Amino acid sequence: DDPTSTFTCPGGSNYK
């Protein structure tokens, strides 16, 4: 997962 193209939830998991 690319953190520049995803957003991070409060739990720290990345979503597309």
Curated annotation (Swiss-Prot):
The lineage of its organism: Eukaryota, Viridiplantae, Streptophyta, Embryophyta, Tracheophyta. Belongs to the thaumatin family. Its main location: secreted. It comes from the Eukaryota. It is found in: Secreted; Secreted, Cell wall. GO terms for cellular component: extracellular region. The keyword Disulfide bond applies. It comes from Taxus baccata (English yew). Keywords: Cell wall, Disulfide bond, Secreted. This is Thaumatin-like protein 4.
